[in-house]
């Protein structure tokens, strides 16, 4: 699976477990550490684990194995490293403390929204909406 597709799939899996403020950071022009970060927030340590487990299971079903993971002990910030794409699942207070979006502020940022939170007209048409850092809306079918 190509990195951009993998990042979008991870974002969808996060949203399926009610993660919110899901963003994809495009790091290709900034670092060689990873092509994309996918970052989300959760409301509890139980939800942190549920989101991480769902991402791992969903990626396993797509024959994408996690290369390294960290954070299952504290359940405040779990990192799932898929080499080209790194998923960051945060408890909401920890996300604001570490503020990866600011740290990687030069990266192109795409906000991924849940279709249930979209305006009714777009949701009826079966479209998902993403928003880039330039506040430009992109609709996909």
Q: Model regions: which residues?
A:
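Conserved, well-folded catalytic cores of nucleic-acid-processing
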Residues: 13, 17, 58-62, 92-93, ...
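RNA pseudouridine synthases
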Residues: 78, 88-90, 95-108, 120
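Glycine/charge-rich, flexible interdomain linkers and switch-proximal surface loops
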Residues: 22-33, 65-84
